[in-house]
Amino acid sequence: MQDITSESIAEFITSHDIPLMATQTKLCIPIIFRMCQKMLHGIKFDEIKVCDNLIIDGHHRYLSAFIINHKLGQVPTNSTSATEPISWDLVKFVEDDWDTPAKIDYLNELDAKYNKLEIEFVKQITSR
């Protein structure tokens, strides 16, 4: 897998037709990286929540799965009056990690337990 950077994501977005629309203005590159790594190693994720063609919950999961050509489930949900569609080329991809080291450890532990994997393996595949 190529490195996940704002440039590689922008290039990916311009060269692919992404069926679902974003409703979030910013996404976190380190989270996308970790999710791509986990998906590539068979770790399962919850479905994303979609209303019509809008992502309501699961932007990082959706884009990560799309980048690595991984099938991710979708469940219907409702939107609110505040939900606004955003073109993917207007979404800002930030380098700052939104997850604390403690949260990363917690999520890795959950994923290891749920997928019956050793925690050290999950830590290894998600470290840069």
Region spans (language model):
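Short alpha-helix boundary/capping and kink motifs at helix termini
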Residues: 2-56, 60-66, 73, 78
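N-terminal non-globular leader segments, chiefly Sec-dependent signal peptides
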Residues: 1-13, 110, 122-128
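Basic- and aromatic-enriched surface patches that contact anionic nucleotides/nucleic acids
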Residues: 47-128
